[in-house]
Amino acid sequence: MRVRSEALAMFSALGFARTLIRPVGAPSPGGRRNRFDEIYQSFARLRALHTFIQPPLRTIDQTDMTDLLAATLEHLETLVSFDTRNPPRAIAAEGGIFDYLRAQLPGFQVEVIDHGDGAVSLYAVRGTPKYLFNVHLDTVPDSPHWSADPHVMRRTGDRVIGLGVCDIKGAAAALVAAANAGDGDAAFLFSSDEEANDPRCIAAFLARGLPYDAVLVAEPTMGEAVLAHRGISSVLMRFAGRAGHASGKQDPAASALHQAMRWGGKALDHVDSLAHARFGGLTGLRFNIGRVDGGIKANMIAPAAELRFGFRPLPSMDVDGLLATFAGFADPAAAHFEETFRGPSLPSGDIARAEERRLAARDVADALDLPIGNAVDFWTEASLFSAGGYTALVYGPGDIAQAHTADEFVTLVQLQRYAESVNRIINGSH
């Protein structure tokens, strides 16, 4: 296993050297393949095989369940029972899940703040910790496809099922269990507004400027430290046309829907042109036209249309520049162009600053003996901490593929590994 770890470390180093020797996305002179590309691809093939040479995952039964995992499951069962679906943004500061957490953290200084509209934060500190753990307690709404009550956790074989067990109440339960397994220094920030895309809890915390060496944000990363992910931007556009009968010759700008479709073609072409942009293992720009509304019937020129789109940039991309480019594709100019939500990339900053912050997060992961995973496409609030000046990484149990799904689950192995790692960080040598 040591050989495999060293090979993976060399793979990461080669990837970084590759970007230094030849600018990302640029061809080698004369079209010749860069020698570093050949070496890098060889290690990429070795890396792809590493999962097959790992020891098989051991399943956990009742006889070999650790006390820490048993405590984690007990807390998780209770946390799942609290309805923290978001929307409808109806989570209260008093009673319910926050009273439970306060009661489970004896010896901590606990502060609960209601930021309005279902945004509640619980900040708990014991001693003088170096690291802050952040977990959101809200979940997405359940769907009709659940096979049983989503707020009643149930165990099936090697996993537990329930709304939020993977995203991300399992991490909250493990942190509480670890906190009660010893008396080490610890700091937790629990929040309830992550799924609302209105991060009041994090904004209020950042305004305080409290000193921490790093922030570990819990999201489903399969127990690996994620150092980089995409940002996110959501946009609302409105197009204005002129109503009329569709039988006549039309001015190109007469139909608001035609304007929207022409805009979409230009936008998609631009996205294709960015396919070779790269940062930390991520490539290209993720882009989606999610909804188009407008028009009345087939023989009427559409007087108005509304379009919603979103994109997920690389940490190295200029979001304001992308927005200006997308707005400029509207001809005539869109009647309305509004960015409705923005989440920065992780790490934040320009290319040089982002890389500096990524390396700082890597050093934290190494110091805490956390395995380092690949960059991911999904967005997390770790980027908000990074933009606020903290070294931040994403680390939690579970697979993102299970988040937001019916019969959401997390495996016992994932919960136990995460619980053991945070217990070591809180009560061990770190």
State where each predicted segment sits:
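Glycine-biased, low-complexity coil/linker segments
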Residues: M1-V3, G30-R32
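Low-acidity, Ser/Thr- and Arg-rich intrinsically disordered low-complexity segments
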Residues: R2-S5, S12, R47
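N-terminal polybasic/positive-inside topogenic patches
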Residues: R22, S28-G31, A44-R58
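N-terminal helical capping/dimerization or prosegment-like subdomains
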Residues: D64-S143, A304-R308, L322-T325, L412-Q414, ...
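Active-site metal-coordination/substrate-binding segment of hydrolases
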Residues: L132-F190
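Acidic/histidine-rich catalytic neighborhood of metal-dependent amide-processing enzymes
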Residues: G164, I168-S234, F279
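Metal-dependent amide/peptide-bond hydrolase catalytic core
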Residues: D67, D114-H115, P141, S233-H430
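Aromatic (phenylalanine/tyrosine) cluster motif
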Residues: F11, F16, F36, Y40-F43, ...
